[in-house]
Amino acid sequence: MEFLKMHGLGNDFVVVDEIKNQNLVNKNLSDLAKKICDRRFGIGADGLVLLLPSEKADFKMRIINSDGSEAEMCGNAIRCVARYYVEKYNPAKKQLEVETLAGIIKPEVLENNMVRVDMGRPILKPQEIPVAVEEEPVNIPLEVLGQKFYFTAVSMGNPHAVIFVDSLAKIELEKYGPLIETHPLFPRKTNVEFVEILSPAKVKVFVWERGAGATLACGTGASAVVVAGRILGHLQEDVEVVLPGGSLFINWVFGESVYMTGPAEIVFKGEYFL
């Protein structure tokens, strides 16, 4: 099986093109992703990403996390597959439509390996995120291991709990991340973002991804952070989101789509023996 190793700010993926040859159609993708993503016994990645034929878009993207679970959407992965598709199939076409479990996502391939993505409008209704609260899911108290946090829940096609803190230096991500991810308030689990505000135009973020753990970057997470920060009155429309792997640039006007801009890098290509 031929593959590409790609990453968006260190959030890395094994990318497999199944558009013309569906070699994996009868494979257990959950088991395969666990093996491929293992950093000692496999290739090593945060997820396995497949490009598949689509009847309603340029192609379909599926993302299987390193734990074998399937994600609805991934902002870093969508940038990677958009760059790959344009370079492989249609260099003249810069604006794409990609079918995902979160709906049709619209990336635009720019110069210098940058990709701008229309992430769609954020979902803010509790039952649609989903989060088990009756009220608007803004600044909701949550206690884990005796530590009280306040989260704002946002869905960018996948659920996020955004937590603003005074300093990220005090946050033990590996300690609190998995407990918040699996908290009963989140029926489908959740991604978790801890956020330190540097200015109305710049934030620093640690990410705990549902199904992948601590990652160097998260595109939907960066988008959710800016949405939550705007709702709370902390942030302006254009924000640089500084992640461990680098910066993403997010734009959100109330009532409109969120736009994310960031890099997509090809590291190497190879063959994996099934």
From Swiss-Prot:
HAMAP family for the chain: DAP_epimerase
Binding residue positions for substrate: 11, 65, 75-76, 158, 191, 209-210, 219-220
Quaternary organization: Homodimer.
Identification of the protein by name: Diaminopimelate epimerase
Role played: Catalyzes the stereoinversion of LL-2,6-diaminopimelate (L,L-DAP) to meso-diaminopimelate (meso-DAP), a precursor of L-lysine and an essential component of the bacterial peptidoglycan.
Assigned EC number: 5.1.1.7
Site (described: Could be important to modulate the pK values of the two catalytic cysteine residues): 160, 209
Cellular component, GO, one term: cytosol
Pfam families assigned to the protein according to its UniProt record, in alphabetical order: DAP_epimerase
Keyword annotations of the record: Amino-acid biosynthesis, Cytoplasm, Isomerase, Lysine biosynthesis
GO biological process: one example: lysine biosynthetic process via diaminopimelate
Keyword Nucleotide-binding annotated: no
Pathway noted in the entry: Amino-acid biosynthesis; L-lysine biosynthesis via DAP pathway; DL-2,6-diaminopimelate from LL-2,6-diaminopimelate: step 1/1
Main localization of the protein described in the UniProt heading: cytoplasm
Family per similarity comment: Belongs to the diaminopimelate epimerase family.
One GO MF term: diaminopimelate epimerase activity
Protein localization: Cytoplasm
Signal peptide span: none
Active site: residue positions: 74 (proton donor), 218 (proton acceptor)
Catalytic activity entry: (2S,6S)-2,6-diaminopimelate = meso-2,6-diaminopimelate
SUPFAM superfamilies, per database record: Diaminopimelate epimerase-like (SSF54506)
